[in-house]
Amino acid sequence: MNVKHVLFILTNTPQIGPNQRPTGYFFSEVAHPYEVFDHAGIAIEYASPLGGTPPEDGYDEADGVQLAFRHSKAIRRMARSRKLSEVDVLDYDAVFFPGGLGPMMDIAIDPEVKRVVARAWDAGKIVAAVCHGPAAFLGVTLADGTPLIRGRQLTSFSNEEEAGYAQADVPFLLEDALRTEGADYAATSVWQSKVVIDGRLFTGQNPASAGPLAQAIVAALQGEPA
């Protein structure tokens, strides 16, 4: 059996904004994709720019999927995430960036993140992100000199969603930044699920999109039509 491998790349940022709002990765955007991938028999590994334990945000114990992940061996592995510069992205079939506000601070600007995303794309891998995770794609230039997202269809946490959530905390509006780099951006109603697939670029709009995004990635890895 050919086991597929997905690399989760998480933030190391625990605070954001002028009031030092606690943040990190958004818990459901790891827990729900993990459940989908694990059920499909896909192997998951974890990395972050600095390595170690990624800070978390938004845990909801009333969500059974999150509760199960909280008490899983997987979260203990994630607490020992590998330093991204020590990971060979070519060992994986897909890379996935969960959201949370943290990625707006480190994932959005980290040079190693940009190198890994470009290398994964140029090697034919699936590149995926949800919510604020597409900040990873900003500034990524491919081997042929073109920006990764120019002319590509994608989604992310929308300006409308940010206005009611963290506009005072984030250093920029992600939707605006993606559009500025030439992305063909689309979003649905606030907090509703939306997944956009453009070739090997897979994106989800918000927390509600995390599970469906993972399902789309599984289908692609297993050779099913989109």
Which residues does each PLM region occupy?
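Alpha-helical segment proximal to the catalytic Tyr-Lys
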Residues: 131
